[in-house]
Amino acid sequence: MSTRANTLQENSATEFSSIGPDVWQGKENPLFIESDNLCAAWKTHALENDHLSVRIGRWNIPGEPIVILVDFQPFFEKKNDIYTEMWNRFQVDSLHAYGDYDEASMFSYAAGRVVESFYRYNLTETDKVVYQAHEWMTGMGALYVQEAVPEVATIFTTHATSSDVR
């Protein structure tokens, strides 16, 4: 992100923000500059009405893009329900997952919930919004957004390569 954020902001007529996991909880993050003013009313709404704990600020990188950090830990207690929902709606099979699948999925789901909450509170269907998910780790959030906020366009980017050239 540090190599692209400045370019995105300079060459775009739109706002650019990102959503990240709040893994530093309670500790100072040298890459994050927290703001008490950015989206303050929505932040309160998100916590009180949508049960989303977020911190809002800017990445401490060139361009200083806005970032919303979300605490995704509370979603672990609902993990089985979330996976059931993903299976029923999209046939995403989480039964045989391993490694960092759970952590990535819970963050991704939380990010999707953040988009839904932010959109419903701040925007209307005439606003043009794109949710870009990078790699499989954020795919669940894109699926959630497609279902919960169909007004938001979704893009999935993968950087996978294959050495199996035929």
Question: What are these model-derived regions, one by one?
Answer:
Residues 1-166:
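Catalytic cores of nucleotide-sugar-dependent glycosyltransferases that transfer UDP/GDP/TDP-activated
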